[in-house]
Amino acid sequence: MRYLFPTRWKVQKLDRLGFVGRGRSRHRPRNEPSLYGGEYPFFQTGDIKAANLYLSEYSQTYNEKGLAQSKQWEPGTLCITIAANIAETAILGIRGCFPDSVIGFIADPAKTDVHFIKYYIDL
């Protein structure tokens, strides 16, 4: 463990503190033009890396076809990159989709706070 915490705290796996799920982009190739150009924000790993705390700026959007092969995540979801820019984090400020190169974490408020998890990963 990198840091000492109060002895009453217990080390937990992330999935014990909330929901952990992988982003979704089923269609191959992922860059198929017919998936893009709609109203649904699609966050890439570079967007997450560029965000300071909250993620609301995006470089691409999905249309209905793109959304159908993906998943929308709610604001407050912690995005953690697992490819290209590894372990970069940002909290969704708006609804949006992200590819399978990103993990989404939704904190159980009775167990932890998404900001704490973000800052712990970022340390």
Q: PLM features: residue spans?
A:
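Non-catalytic DNA-recognition/assembly elements of restriction-modification systems
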Residues: 1-25
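Basic, amphipathic alpha-helical recognition segments used for DNA target recognition
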Residues: 13-19, 49-55, 72-75, 91-97, ...
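DNA target-recognition patches
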Residues: 15-18, 29-64
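Short, well-ordered loop/turn elements at secondary-structure boundaries
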Residues: 36-38, 73-76
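A generic structural signal for residues embedded in beta-strands
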Residues: 80-81
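Short glycine-rich, flexible loops that bind phosphorylated cofactors or substrates
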Residues: 88
